[in-house]
Amino acid sequence: MSAPRTLYDKIWDDHLVNQQDDGTCLLYIDRHLVHEVTSPQAFEGLRMAGRKVRAPEKTLAVVDHNVPTSPDRHLGIKNEESRIQVEALARNAADFGVEYYSENDKRQGIVHIVGPEQGFTLPGMTIVCGDSHTSTHGAFGALAHGIGTSEVEHVLATQTLIQKKAKNMLVRVDGQLPPGVTAKDIILAIIGEIGTAGGTGHVIEFAGEAIRSLSMEGRMTICNMTIEGGARAGLIAPDETTFDYIKDKPRAPKGKAWDMALDYWKTLHTDEGAHYDRIVVLDAADLPPIVSWGSSPEDVISVQGAVPNPDDIQEETKRASKWRALDYMGLKPGTKITDIAVDRVFIGSCTNGRIEDLRAVAKVVEGRKVASTVSAMIVPGSGLVKEQAEAEGLDKIFKEAGFDWREPGCSMCLAMNDDRLKPGERCASTSNRNFEGRQGFKGRTHLVSPAMAAAAAVAGHFVDIREWK
């Protein structure tokens, strides 16, 4: 009888092609997502070597990082570098026979939102993309992670990837989430607990009642930010919630193929007695709405808290780092989080740009107005999300409240397109990174949930969503 295995062990074993004595392994890759930023050199490498894409039907190309989200984007991309990258992806997809969603295709959007929407992402698969937030797809019980440009070329050419196996880590969130606390708060709390290096060398499996109670969209938010916790990939075992989400998607198996897939997917869970190298346990009842205060995703605190004093940190290097963060953020120790005013609000990204996120925002802002001191924008994660939001009338709620309703794309999550902060501007953002300059040169980013961002837009400063009337 074989030893008990974790979910990660099972997916790894099912895709192992070869293993060397030093632990170097060759893994088969089921799905490959590509976008315009990390793929041009990879396709050019194939072209120069005279190679084809080995399995074009297992590759999907989407533009997202560089595309403008303004209503006039049909007029073309003004930035020359961005335009060149987008045009290169269109040309490469055509030359190599890869399916491609252009900025004019309603299926276009952020690659990690598009994959699940299309049923391209399925349980038990290995999924890669030249993007660190590929971990998002782990919400389906898929082993998904980012790869570098040279690896993108390797996967295009061989449909395999050279890797070494990571360690197993379990993060269990027990109990029920209190009102006002969301998946975004869970993952920020986890990163605050383990630090940005806490998952280094591991694949994290998320489990527990609070995780199980989440929708697929909430689970994607959790797995999306696994990389911010230092782990390469995050996993949540598939269940009926997963299967119900997938069933009607365009690329999902149909008929007998569905029944066969379902039988396999139901085996994708960690066996009782399986070994984890590290276990972290949180109690959902203890979790508040969370706001980041510094320039690292681990710099988080309750909305009811105050900016911490770095002098309380024993370790000298870390203490200096946190003082630098406060200086960059223009904050002083002891400042109440609810006293921090914001200039901008960004709602979107592959972390929180899905329809449930937008519904949560609409509940907060309906019948209210964005503060006169705030500029706020909402960027749907895909054309299909935008279409659904407009069918539900959410866009009218947003526009009447004073939000800028945009076209789909990565937008202000990162300063690679026209949507960016000006120096010194402070932003409540539903994205995933608050590094220095992430949203624009000298821009200041606070990571929050969609509901918290929406409330900040109306109030002009951070407020506790639990007290929102």
UniProtKB/Swiss-Prot annotation:
GO terms for biological process: L-leucine biosynthetic process. The keyword Iron-sulfur applies. It is an enzyme of class 4 (lyase). Heterodimer of LeuC and LeuD. InterPro entries: 3-IsopropMal_deHydase_lsu (IPR004430), Acnase/IPM_dHydase_lsu_aba_1/3 (IPR015931), Acoase/IPM_deHydtase_lsu_aba (IPR001030), Aconitase_4Fe-4S_BS (IPR018136), Aconitase_4Fe-4S_dom (IPR036008), IPM_dehydratase_rel_enz (IPR050067), IPMI_cat (IPR033941). This is 3-isopropylmalate dehydratase large subunit. Its EC number is 4.2.1.33. The keyword Membrane does not apply. Binds 1 [4Fe-4S] cluster per subunit. Coiled coil: none annotated. Signal peptide: none annotated. It comes from the Bacteria. Its cofactor is [4Fe-4S] cluster. Belongs to the aconitase/IPM isomerase family. LeuC type 1 subfamily. GO terms for molecular function: 3-isopropylmalate dehydratase activity; 4 iron, 4 sulfur cluster binding; metal ion binding. Keywords: 4Fe-4S, Amino-acid biosynthesis, Branched-chain amino acid biosynthesis, Iron, Iron-sulfur, Leucine biosynthesis, Lyase, Metal-binding. [4Fe-4S] cluster binds at C350, C410, C413. It catalyses: (2R,3S)-3-isopropylmalate = (2S)-2-isopropylmalate. Catalyzes the isomerization between 2-isopropylmalate and 3-isopropylmalate, via the formation of 2-isopropylmaleate.
